[in-house]
């Protein structure tokens, strides 16, 4: 039976896992470093795939005052609202249900956008990733910056895995793997591949370091996320 790439994100147990991470893990040191380098606290920020509210909570607690956190999953939206409201009731209104591939905001609505922890790579096909990139590009202001991460299949443990494994659907980098709840789909890209998709959708890469090249993330972050590659791209 064909597996549904969205099913994992619609489950209560998955949402609870990410809600706990919002409180226990928080913003990574590597994320914070890039946020401080490329974002300012007075900018309007769009978060895609907010999950349980980890990044949104960290941004709001750090003084970023205009944050819109979104997720396509109703249960994720519900729990993210609860997590934020537990800290400040006014923050509950910062969370909205949106599909990253078909954002409904007006053109040039945001100064910055972030799609944390490989969320873009959990979209099921290249066509979906390109649709999301075009949608994000549309709602960013001219010169706006998009920050996201992508699992790199040429580095670290990913490289060792892909040296001996075949892709699950004959597309290099596509993989279903077990989680604490249900199987989850993720695409592990190469740097050249992701740079190409960004160029195709109107973005220029500013930098794309591995998380370990930015900062020493703590043990909770390493357990939660492992190694990943950050991309910082500007709307051309």
PLM segments and residue spans:
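Class I SAM-dependent methyltransferase SAM/SAH-binding core
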Residues: 52-102
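Conserved class I S-adenosyl-L-methionine
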Residues: 1-40, 43-51, 58
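A short glycine-rich, Lys/Arg-flanked "PGG" loop and its adjoining helix->strand segment in the class I
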Residues: 130-142
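Core SAM-dependent methyltransferase catalytic element
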Residues: 219-236
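A short acidic, Gly/Pro-enriched loop at the edge of an enzyme's catalytic core
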Residues: 101, 105-112
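SAM-dependent methyltransferase
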Residues: 143-198, 206-215
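A short SAM/SAH-binding and catalytic strip from SAM-dependent methyltransferases
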Residues: 112-127
């Amino acid at each position: 039976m064909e597996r549904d790439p969205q099913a994992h994100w619609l489950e209560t147990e998955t949402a609870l896992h990410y809600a706990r991470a919002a409180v226990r893990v928080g913003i990574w040191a590597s994320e914070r470093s890039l946020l401080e380098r490329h974002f300012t606290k007075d900018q309007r920020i769009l978060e895609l795939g907010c999950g349980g509210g980890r990044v949104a909570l960290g941004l709001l607690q750090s003084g970023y005052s205009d944050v819109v956190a979104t997720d396509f999953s109703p249960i994720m939206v519900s729990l993210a609202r609860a997590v934020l409201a537990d800290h400040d009731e006014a923050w509950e209104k910062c969370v909205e249900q949106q599909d990253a591939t078909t954002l409904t905001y007006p053109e040039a609505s945001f100064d910055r956008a972030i799609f944390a922890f490989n969320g873009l790579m959990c979209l099921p096909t290249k066509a979906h990733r390109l649709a999301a990139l075009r949608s994000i590009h549309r709602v960013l202001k001219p010169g706006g910056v998009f920050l996201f991460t992508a699992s790199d299949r040429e580095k670290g443990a990913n490289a060792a895995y892909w040296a001996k494994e075949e892709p699950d659907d004959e597309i290099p980098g596509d993989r279903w793997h077990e989680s604490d709840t249900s199987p989850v789909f993720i695409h592990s890209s190469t740097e050249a591949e992701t740079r190409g998709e960004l160029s195709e959708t109107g973005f220029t890469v500013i930098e794309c370091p591995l998380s370990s090249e930015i900062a020493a993330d703590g043990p909770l972050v390493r357990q939660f996320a492992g190694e990943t590659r950050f991309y910082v791209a500007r709307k051309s």
